[in-house]
């Protein structure tokens, strides 16, 4: 089966993970990426370089201008040449409804699917960010929703088909690993949180963890965390917070006895990618509670949850003084995430199975 995966393609977690999984399943896969369209060109002067960079940043941020037109034209041309059975567009902020209509006219047998890890219908996002995607929703053959609550919302704005597609972990990157002595110095701790900052209750929760004297580490985008680590007397010791990627991300999880999982209130999350990555790493996950995440792991047996700051601190103290229980719950969570097929290859297999069943024998989509 021929599949074209389109997206920004900056991260190995998203488009690249999908691409690799589909290849593992034996399909012929091509990529279409648009982040490189916004790379600054070489200029003779520093001023020329800065003007070019500013111009491209503006077009990329506000999704206007000749570069956006070129991206859409090039996607149409690649689809015309490759003639995929499936066009899978990841976070299609840059792709317009007109483009999808053009693709459908020249390649009517191609199924066009869209997917987002962010919540494009949440009120906290700037309206301009998702305007092209939302306008194009009726032009997709199927929208894959990251969250349960988005399913009906997508239908209300014209989606033809909507199906839940949860996030995933990548077995090659998210797995138990024994840390070297040097890595233990860098990553060893009682409790870790790896993720971005949001102006929600996580600040109070993290401050309380530090206040109670637990050995805590935090990793994430510095531009997110700087706004709080420079203001909070308790969190100043962590400034500057640094991100971790690839093998270091996995080591940051494996180096902790407990890994925290907070949900994005901006995206109205009831689970997140780390819901699967933390158990896959073999570390105990202590997650913010939701009814949704409680359907995936048995509380106190395969992971644990907190609903209040007091419950969070109490459970941290319990697991740090009961090693055997902590190891047992972490191991059970690791088995659960594997048994329930939360890995990216299984996700893509489930996706293709859904498409095959939905479009029947008239489709060239095969699982």
What does each of the following model-derived ranges do?
Residues 1-52, 59, 67-77, 81-82, ...:
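Nucleotide-sugar donor-binding catalytic core of glycosyltransferases
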Residues 88:
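N-terminal Rossmann-like NAD(P) cofactor-binding module of classical short-chain dehydrogenase/reductase
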Residues 100-114, 139:
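Charged, glycine-enriched surface loops/patches
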Residues 110-126:
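A short, histidine- and acid-enriched strand-loop-helix "catalytic/donor-clamping" loop
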Residues 303-309, 319-323:
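Conserved acidic donor-binding segment of nucleotide-sugar-dependent glycosyltransferases
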Residues 321-353:
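A charged, aromatic-enriched C-terminal amphipathic alpha-helix characteristic of glycosyltransferases
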């Amino acid at each position: 089966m021929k599949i074209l995966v389109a997206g920004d393609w900056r991260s190995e977690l998203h488009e690249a993970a999908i691409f690799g999984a589909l290849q593992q399943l034996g399909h012929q896969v091509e990529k279409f990426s648009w982040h490189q369209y916004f790379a600054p060109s070489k200029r003779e002067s520093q001023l020329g370089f800065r003007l070019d960079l500013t111009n491209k940043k503006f077009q990329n941020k506000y999704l206007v201008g000749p570069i956006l037109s070129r991206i859409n034209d090039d996607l149409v041309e690649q689809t015309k040449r490759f003639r995929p059975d499936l066009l899978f567009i990841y976070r299609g902020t840059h792709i317009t409804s007109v483009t999808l209509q053009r693709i459908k006219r020249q390649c009517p047998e191609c199924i066009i699917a869209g997917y987002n890890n962010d919540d494009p219908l949440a009120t906290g996002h700037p309206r301009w960010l998702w305007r092209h995607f939302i306008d194009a929703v009726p032009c997709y053959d199927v929208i894959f929703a990251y969250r349960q609550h988005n399913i009906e919302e997508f239908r209300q704005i014209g989606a033809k088909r909507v199906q839940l597609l949860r996030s995933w972990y990548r077995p090659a990157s998210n797995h138990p690993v024994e840390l070297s002595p040097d890595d233990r110095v860098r990553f060893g701790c009682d409790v870790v949180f790896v993720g971005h900052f949001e102006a929600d209750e996580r600040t109070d929760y993290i401050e309380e963890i530090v206040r109670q004297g637990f050995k805590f580490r935090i990793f994430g985008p510095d531009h997110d965390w700087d706004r709080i680590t420079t203001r909070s007397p308790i969190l100043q010791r962590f400034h500057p917070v640094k991100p971790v990627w690839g093998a270091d991300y996995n080591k940051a999880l494996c180096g902790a006895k407990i890994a925290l999982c907070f949900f994005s209130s901006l995206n109205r999350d009831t689970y997140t990618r780390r819901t699967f990555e933390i158990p896959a790493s073999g570390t105990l996950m202590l997650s913010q509670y939701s009814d949704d995440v409680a359907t995936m792991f048995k509380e106190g047996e395969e992971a644990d949850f907190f609903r209040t700051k007091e419950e969070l601190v109490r459970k941290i103290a319990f697991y740090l003084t009961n090693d055997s229980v902590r190891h047992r719950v972490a191991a059970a969570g690791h088995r659960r995430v594997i048994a329930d097929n939360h890995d990216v290859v299984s996700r893509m297999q489930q996706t293709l199975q859904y498409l095959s069943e939905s479009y029947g024998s008239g489709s060239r989509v095969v699982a």
